[in-house]
Amino acid sequence: MEKRAVVLYSGGLDSTTCLAMAKADGFAPYAMSFSYGQRHGFELEVAKANARPLGAVEHLVVDFDLRRMGGSALTDDISVPKEGVGSDIPVTYVPARNTIFLSFALGWAEVLGAFDIYIGVNSLDYSGYPDCRPEFVSAFEALANLATKSGVEGQGHFSIRTPLINMTKAEIIKAGVALGVDYSWTHSCYDPESDGTSCGRCDSCRLRLKGFAEAGLVDPLTYSGR
């Protein structure tokens, strides 16, 4: 039987790198994306177009609407900050988003008989999100093995794999390039133009551009703000 893993895949730089890493680790990757009412929906279109070409065995898109709860510039009519990356938890934080995403991934993993879940969280070049920290990942992994039939019956041990967690954005990009990732097939912007062109000024764009610059590489995307 193939060794399966669920990969949380948004269409962004980090999750695309994770998908390549899961393949390199010998897993058959099953990609999971989310349509949760995000304003930056172009990223999801990128994910839909590229999951299979990038090597996903299946690509499951889960639909739910976090706009009904509110609380984030990524789902509400709140301006996305363009003044630079700060140290506080930003308004682009989506309440409990990674907990929600990982819960869906855990359910699918149990159905698939997969005990490995990849998520591209990063605790170095990140924007202050509490659900990108190692402490959060460890806590969710413990929960996964307590809250599932497979875990309780000892069929296997669920592992939340975070290969990017201690890497800078430049290191992530270099690792992806070494694995053959084409970053023109990714999208990172929180506030793109209607045609999908990245703004070049939001936190996500700034971190991406900084990563490419520090890696000594040219970002293949075009930006409206530059």
From Swiss-Prot:
One of its GO terms (biological process) is queuosine biosynthetic process. InterPro entries: QueC, Rossmann-like_a/b/a_fold. Zn(2+) binds at C189, C199, C202, C205. The keyword tRNA processing does not apply. Its cofactor is Zn(2+). Its EC number is 6.3.4.20. Pathway: Purine metabolism; 7-cyano-7-deazaguanine biosynthesis. ATP binds at Y9, S10, G11, G12, L13, D14, S15, T16, T17, C18, L19. The keyword Cell cycle does not apply. It comes from the Bacteria. It is an enzyme of class 6 (ligase). Binds 1 zinc ion per subunit. Keywords: ATP-binding, Ligase, Metal-binding, Nucleotide-binding, Queuosine biosynthesis, Zinc. Transmembrane segments: none annotated. It catalyses: 7-carboxy-7-deazaguanine + NH4(+) + ATP = 7-cyano-7-deazaguanine + ADP + phosphate + H2O + H(+). GO terms for molecular function: ATP binding; ligase activity, forming carbon-nitrogen bonds; zinc ion binding. NCBIfam families: 7-cyano-7-deazaguanine synthase QueC. Belongs to the QueC family. Catalyzes the ATP-dependent conversion of 7-carboxy-7-deazaguanine (CDG) to 7-cyano-7-deazaguanine (preQ(0)). This is 7-cyano-7-deazaguanine synthase. It comes from Pelobacter propionicus (strain DSM 2379 / NBRC 103807 / OttBd1). The gene is queC.
